[in-house]
Design a protein with these regions (language model features):
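Internal helix-loop-helix
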Residues: 4-65, 69-75, 116-122, 243, ...
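Secondary-structure edge/capping motif, primarily at the C-terminal ends of alpha-helices
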Residues: 220-225, 250-258, 286
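A short, Trp-centered hydrophobic/proline-enriched beta-strand micro-motif
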Residues: 74-82, 126
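Glycine-rich beta->alpha junctions and the first turn(s) of the following alpha-helix
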Residues: 151-248, 310-313
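Glycine-rich phosphate/pyrophosphate-binding beta-alpha loops
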Residues: 87, 112-117, 159-160, 312-313
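A structural signal for short hydrophobic beta-strand segments in well-ordered beta-sheet cores
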Residues: 96-99
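A short core secondary-structure module
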Residues: 94, 104, 108-154
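Alpha-helix capping/hinge segments and adjacent helical runs
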Residues: 4, 20, 266, 270-313
Length: 313
């Protein structure tokens, strides 16, 4: 809400929706400088960078008027209801069902790996609205309030010790008939557009966080003498080169003027995940045997966190 009071939410949104409508170059500058300064993760980033662009592109004027102000003011938080126990990388295998009855959409099913569900007021959900449909067909994109009977949220304890992810169960949950984005059956199209926004400009800020992690690793290598190992020095150099390459490729994509760039952005995320996983492995090798047991103090604790979190990228 402090960021919102200064007008730092929705930088790229059209002015008609309360944004600043800044050009890509200035959005890049903001995200990188925010991360460079060590700014914390923002609770409302799912609403700001995923839900809001989706509503702007696919939502009705009534949906935009209802939901965008809460996101822009930092008062309403959203989470993403995509993955299921049997539908992760094969997202089209979704089994959560929804049906329209008595003026409401009713939901039955389960979502998993739902980031920040325990802190959110709303969830956007892909559910199967056409009985007997398979794959990408027959899916709908719903906006569902979480504070209601029929919704149960169970935290998932991570190996980092945190519980950022959750399981979300729908058993008799419902939402209003007009809380559907696009037409019934358009869910796949809307969901894929949203994933394009997910690889948008804020990822440049993520690279700056990666730069902080790399510097932490370099400092630790100096402190413990691991930098005397030629193979460690070579891998540190490779990590530095890889990070600069990621940034150059991201800027090249965004220079074309599109903040949501579809398949190219997904390939970029694949490269980012591989880079971060390699950094996590390097962190463990720099720590050596000191990293084998759970650390309670920095920098070992933070390096272990890098390794743990990189497993899920």
């Amino acid at each position: 809400q402090v960021m919102a009071s200064g007008g730092w939410i929705g930088l790229g949104w059209p002015r008609a929706h309360g944004g600043r409508e800044l050009p890509v170059s200035l959005q890049v500058a903001f995200h990188e400088e925010y991360a460079r300064a060590g700014g914390p993760g923002r609770m409302g980033h799912i609403g700001e960078t995923l839900m809001a662009p989706t509503l702007i592109d696919f939502g009705t004027p009534e949906q935009q008027a209802r939901f965008l102000p809460g996101i822009r003011e930092g008062k309403v938080f959203w989470c993403q209801g995509y993955s299921e126990p049997g539908a992760g990388s094969d997202l089209a295998a979704i089994r959560t069902r929804c049906w329209l009855e008595d003026g409401k959409w009713h939901l039955q099913g389960q979502k998993v790996w739902t980031s920040l569900a325990h802190e959110s007021e709303w969830i956007f959900v892909i559910a199967r609205s056409t009985p007997g449909s398979v794959g990408r067909d027959g899916l709908s994109f719903l906006l569902v309030p979480l504070d209601q009977p029929g919704v149960e949220i169970r935290p998932i304890r991570q190996m980092t010790g945190e519980a950022e992810f959750n399981e979300v169960f729908f058993d008799g949950a419902c939402t209003a008939a007009d809380c559907i984005v696009g037409a019934p059956g358009d869910g796949w199209k809307v969901a894929m557009a949203l994933l394009g926004y997910e690889r948008g400009l804020s990822t440049l800020g993520q690279q700056m966080h990666f730069s902080h992690e790399l510097q932490l690793l370099v400092d630790a290598a100096h402190a413990c003498g691991a930098d005397q190992d030629l193979s460690i020095r070579r891998r540190i150099a490779d990590a530095w080169i890889g990070l600069r390459t990621l940034r150059a490729n991201a800027l090249r994509i965004f220079a074309r003027g599109e903040a949501a760039v579809g398949p190219e952005a997904l390939v970029y995320k694949y490269a980012w995940s591989n880079w971060h996983r390699n950094l996590g492995e390097l962190a463990m090798d720099v720590m050596g045997t000191a990293g084998d047991l759970e650390a309670q103090e920095d920098p070992l604790r933070r390096l272990q966190q890098v390794f743990f979190f990189s497993r899920a990228d």
